[in-house]
Amino acid sequence: MRVKRGFKARRRRNKVLKLAKGFRGSRSKLYRTAADAVDKALGYAYRDRRAKKRDFRKLWIARINAASKMNNISYSKLIHGLKLAKVELDRKVLADLAVSDPAGFSQIALKAAAQL
């Protein structure tokens, strides 16, 4: 018996076109260009979910470095001093403290400097 696959093929194509919604021009209308655009977009999304983690870590380090320089200690010495003082604050929390509570960050920097 011959199988025509009409329903299955339509469903598969509609799934791709649904993912391409919001793309410009033929990339959201024509299956072939939409399929290419969706593949590319999913690849970028996969890549950038990983890059996001690196980007945020870079941002946190830049903020901590700026705040630690204001307290006359380098970033690397601050982190080393915190490890010696057994202060287990991660970079995300330290960066947030540096921005939202500079006085609190200064206390932490003093504690780190005392251990060096």
From Swiss-Prot:
- CDD domains from the entry? Ribosomal_L20 (cd07026)
For biological process, the GO terms are: ribosomal large subunit assembly; translation
GO cellular component entries:
ribonucleoprotein complex; ribosome
Q: Which InterPro entries match?
A: Ribosomal_bL20, RIBOSOMAL_L20_CS, Ribosomal_protein_bL20_C
Q: Name one molecular function that GO assigns to this entry.
A: rRNA binding
Task: Fetch the Pfam families from UniProt.
Answer: Ribosomal_L20
Q: Where are the transmembrane segments?
A: none
Function according to Swiss-Prot or TrEMBL: Binds directly to 23S ribosomal RNA and is necessary for the in vitro assembly process of the 50S ribosomal subunit. It is not involved in the protein synthesizing functions of that subunit.
Name the UniProt record assigns to this protein:
Large ribosomal subunit protein bL20
